[in-house]
Amino acid sequence: MAAVNKDPRDVIIAPVVSEKSYGLIDEGKYTFLVDPRSNKTEIKLAIESIFRVEVASVNTLNRQGKTRRTKFGLGKRKDTKRAIVTLKSGSIDIFTAVG
């Protein structure tokens, strides 16, 4: 079960600003960077409480950080988790609502 005592702003880190995520907005789908330890239920509750919208579904994907060469050998970017949130109705203005 989801931890209800988590702050929603600790679950949702930032909206993803990319060409692909903008294309999904027309379908009512919004993409967010989320805490890698959070589950779909926590993400749904966080989106509903922050933006005051009704969520239909949440799809998540884990992205592995790339390995990069540095002056000191190999380094690795951190792993990230993204959530694609589909709304039942309404929309989110991601440029003014977050902050």
From Swiss-Prot:
It comes from the Bacteria. One of its GO terms (cellular component) is ribosome. Part of the 50S ribosomal subunit. Contacts protein L29, and trigger factor when it is bound to the ribosome. The lineage of its organism: Bacteria, Bacillati, Actinomycetota, Actinomycetes, Micrococcales. The keyword rRNA-binding applies. This is Large ribosomal subunit protein uL23. One of its GO terms (molecular function) is structural constituent of ribosome. It comes from Leifsonia xyli subsp. xyli (strain CTCB07). Belongs to the universal ribosomal protein uL23 family. One of the early assembly proteins it binds 23S rRNA. One of the proteins that surrounds the polypeptide exit tunnel on the outside of the ribosome. Forms the main docking site for trigger factor binding to the ribosome. GO terms for biological process: translation.
